[in-house]
Structure formats: structure tokens, C-alpha cells
């Protein structure tokens, strides 16, 4: 039966030394989503490896994590979660945050983009910004082997926001993070191989 709304997934394991992105690049224009990650060692992958071999972002394709649910903190730096019912933690609480924030209205600017308006003070801790006119969802991920304390480096001019009226909060996300509020200049603790979802907004 013809199903016009059906999605085509491309699934693969690591491909050993070949890597699935190298092996299947020719198929990318014809699929909707990548489901790479069987046997991926997410906690050992460097940021560039995440970006090129897993995320699909350089090729304009979305992705989902697989092996053991991936790393749900670092995955958010690439706007990806595990597939529902694969892994210990449900991605639904993060999806709910996406929905309440209105992520479909945001422009994604990752650490790999020279115009990303949010950076961190530590090169091992990456930030991706999902930018709306009145608020920004920030995903921060610590790729290092140790806990880090970082502060955010924010390009207020490119955001068109008044720093004196800005608020920085970590919303509660079930099984992901507790609610917190940070001052704009304070150091934010990020555990090794984990991260935070933050919302930068203007006080009303």
C-alpha cells in the first residue's frame, strides 16, 4: 500500500574500519534518517567523529543513536536522541522540552559553525545553540575524561539580546537534569561525558 508519509531509515553498524558514513554516502540523498550506531563506542568518540561518522549533519540528514541508547547528553550537541524504547532512558522527556521550547521554529547553530553565538571557555566542552528570536536552547556537552567547570561566551550582538535582561536556566528534564538557575558569568559544572540543556531568555 502506498504510504506518502513513510520515512526511509538507513541502518548500519560501525562498518569496522570503513565506517558507515563512508560506506553509504551515495544513499544519503534518498533517505530521511540515519540509524547508525550499532557497536559505536559513543563515550570514546571525539567531537569530529560524532559530527562526521554519526550525526548526518554534514550531509543534511537527521540521525538517531543506537548502541545502548548512545550518550544522551553528548548526542544533544548534534540534536539527536536515541530511538524510543532502545536503551535504558526514554527520550520522551527531551522531546517534551523540544516541544515546549518550539524547536521547530529555531535555527540550529553548532560548535562547528563559525556563526554559532554560544561557545564555552573550555575547548573540550562544546555548545550548540537552537536560536529563536526571544530565546535560545543551548546544549552543552563535555567530551573530556574529567569533570569541567566552564562559563558561556555569548555573542550578544549576533543574538540581538540585552545582556542586562537575560536569564539563564536549566529546565527540569525527567531522568536527564534537575532545574537550576545560573548567573551569566558564573562557572557551570559539567560532569565528564555528560552535559546540560540550558535556556537563555529575556526577563519579562
Regions found by a protein language model. Give the residues of each.
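C-terminal beta-strand-rich structural cap/linker in extracellular carbohydrate-active enzymes
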Residues: 179-204
Amino acid at each position: 500500500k502506498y504510504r506518502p508519509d513513510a520515512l526511509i531509515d538507513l541502518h548500519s553498524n560501525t562498518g569496522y574500519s570503513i565506517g558507515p558514513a563512508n560506506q553509504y554516502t551515495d544513499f544519503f540523498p534518498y533517505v530521511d534518517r540515519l540509524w547508525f550506531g550499532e557497536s559505536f563506542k559513543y563515550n570514546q568518540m571525539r567531537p569530529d567523529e560524532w559530527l562526521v561518522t554519526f550525526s548526518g549533519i554534514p550531509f543534511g540528514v537527521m540521525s538517531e543513536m543506537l548502541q545502548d541508547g548512545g550518550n544522551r547528553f553528548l548526542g544533544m550537541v548534534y540534536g539527536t536522541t536515541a530511538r524510543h524504547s532502545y536503551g535504558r532512558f526514554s527520550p520522551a522527556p527531551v522531546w517534551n522540552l523540544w516541544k515546549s521550547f518550539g524547536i521547530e521554529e529555531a535555527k540550529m547553530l553548532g560548535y562547528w559553525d563559525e556563526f554559532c553565538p554560544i561557545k564555552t571557555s573550555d575547548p573540550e566542552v562544546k555548545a550548540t545553540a537552537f536560536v529563536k528570536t526571544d530565546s535560545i536552547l543551548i546544549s552543552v556537552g563535555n567530551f573530556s575524561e574529567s569533570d569541567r567547570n566552564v562559563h558561556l561566551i555569548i555573542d550578544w550582538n549576533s543574538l540581538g539580546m540585552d545582556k542586562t535582561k537575560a536569564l539563564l536556566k536549566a529546565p527540569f528534564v525527567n531522568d536527564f537534569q534537575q532545574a537550576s538557575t545560573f548567573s551569566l558569568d558564573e562557572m557551570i559544572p559539567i560532569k565528564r561525558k555528560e552535559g546540560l540543556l540550558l535556556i537563555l531568555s529575556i526577563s519579562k
